[in-house]
Amino acid sequence: MAEEEVDYVFKVVLNGDSAVGKSQLRARFTRDEFSMDSKATIRCRFQYSNAPYYKGAVGAMLVYDMTIRESFEHIPQWLEELRVHADKNIVIILIGNKTDLENQRSVPVEDAKEFAEKEGLFFLETSALNSTNVENSFNTLLTEIFNKVNKKNLAKTTVSCSSQVSLLRPPCVAAQ
């Protein structure tokens, strides 16, 4: 199989409580897979610094399980951790996952929309199980990242045209 040519590589982090579906969202988007017997991956809580995890990230998904109110109530802490350790220009989307369990909903859409609007976040609800809005959520995030990168490069190019010497970083961020 021939290698694909890549123009940009963006580091995107997925944050949220354990078992909200972060790994399943990633698997659904990258491989179009979903595992019914998936085990919750243990990542972290808020107790220790995650600065290395955020280094170089240009996008983030804050994921909660729309059937577990507590996972939504922890989103402000995840957002604070992100804002402390990540680049100030990071693009963030709030994801309410598991819409396939609508009859078990404990987080009203209005609550999540209000929070996202107040914090300046994008917002979508998804289901990794049936693939609802998964591609749309990643594409929304990646499109906004791409737009920011292009604006930043345009500004740098404009500045460098008026300077005699300019050093520009390449327009991509290496994945880690």
Swiss-Prot record:
Q: State the disulfide connectivity.
A: none
Top-rank lineage group of the source organism: Eukaryota
PROSITE patterns (UniProt xref): RAB
The Swiss-Prot or TrEMBL record annotates one GO molecular function as: GTP binding
Record-level GO cellular component terms: endosome; Golgi apparatus
| Pfam families according to UniProt | Ras
Q: Which PANTHER family did the record assign?
A: DRAB11-RELATED
Q: Which family does it belong to?
A: Belongs to the small GTPase superfamily. Rab family.
**Which protein, by its recorded name, is this?**
Putative Ras-related protein RABA4e
Q: What lineage, starting at the top, does this entry show?
A: Eukaryota, Viridiplantae, Streptophyta, Embryophyta, Tracheophyta
